[in-house]
Amino acid sequence: MTESGPLENMLAQMEQAREYVDIDDGIYERLKSPERTLSVSLPVRMDDGSVEVFDAYRCQFDSARGPYKGGIRYHPTVSEEEVSALAGWMTWKTALVDLPFGGAKGGIVCNPKELSDNEIEQLTRRYTEGIRRMIGPETDIPAPDMNTDPRTMAWVMDTYSVYQGYAVPEVVTGKPPEIGGTDGRVEATGRGVSIITEETFEYFDTDIQDADVAIQGFGNVGSVTADLLSERGANIVAVSDVTGAIHDPTGLDIADVQAYADANGGRLEGYDAEPISNDDLLTLDVDALIPAAIEDVITVDVAERLAADVIVEAANGPTTFDAAQVLSDRGVPVVPDILANAGGVIVSYLEWVQNSQQYSWDVEEVNRDLRQRLTGAFDEMLVAYEDRNIPTLRTAAYTIALERSADAHEFRGLFP
């Protein structure tokens, strides 16, 4: 059985929510398609003197609520369809947590593990030059995503600033603190996932001190989530990377796992725990499964065998639409990605505000604001879920996001 791709999944999720909201047909049609997508070819001189050309994209999905906001990812599977879906999800995410942003996403088709630091820098600067007429502190503000980091954002900011003739730190978020980044941004997505997981346990009357948690992915998001949940008393029984997963039913020592990964290039292979496959991890009998890797890992086949009590989506689009239907039929709650991983864009917003005001906040204030916004959005989702008798948490979240986006279009009208 061939399952739908990320863009089809996103549109199907919208369609499910439409039944519960009153949206003008014309506005709904506008919300289904990106406002614009740029495709660029990036010639880069490699370290050996050869020239390689990379395909890249920037999709701007919707700007009714404010400037476009969304990350830049480097991965071999990047495609126009993928960035369009991710830009759409970012639109609903910013609306759900009530940030004054729209949604965007960019990406370069490449394998950064096969590139030197110099080649990645040249590729980043070439990409920035290619999209610089689209981005800006009041138009489109990029951020890190898969395989990009604060250093990458520093190169984007510097390249854009050179063209402007002065420093423009607010053109990107997720920068190093030394050039205008905010403390707490690197950990923000994982911290947000841990906050939402705590709220989810409380809602379903699960004691976090007795909770078993499996996390697919041990990159920036998965590792921070594991560390923070472990600090709160949760039992992290499995984590994974691209080589496979490690499992200990008595609970992994997350600090030790992190130290091992740091010493082995981020790899978990060889760690002193039971090696299992990523598929095995996804079907463990746990209180919470947290997919924190890539899209479409929970397929129909996985959903039929899944034994977790609840899923908290740390990755973007980890559950296919058809798999979500299976989980709904089985009564397995899924806390959607547009809420669970919104911590990153919330703190990106706080960084952008600080840059615009030229006034910095301490990390305690940033984390307080993050928690307040996430718990508020979680409560709003629950109110919609219960009061409107909506069948899933995802659809409840989408009703809020669609209503806010549609209201913005309604007030702004159509020009000309």
Curated annotation (Swiss-Prot):
Pfam families noted in UniProt: ELFV_dehydrog, ELFV_dehydrog_N
Gene3D superfamilies assigned to the protein according to its UniProt record, in alphabetical order: Leucine Dehydrogenase, chain A, domain 1, NAD(P)-binding Rossmann-like Domain
The name this protein goes by in its record: Glutamate dehydrogenase A2
UniProt-listed GO biological process terms: glutamate catabolic process
Highest taxon in the source lineage: Archaea
Subunit structure, interactors included: Homohexamer.
Entry GO MF terms: glutamate dehydrogenase (NAD+) activity
Recorded family membership: Belongs to the Glu/Leu/Phe/Val dehydrogenases family.
E.C. designation(s): 1.4.1.-
PROSITE patterns, per the entry: GLFV_DEHYDROGENASE
Keyword line: Oxidoreductase
Active site as annotated: 105
Note: Strain NRC-36014 contains 4 distinct glutamate dehydrogenases while strain NRC-1 contains only 3.
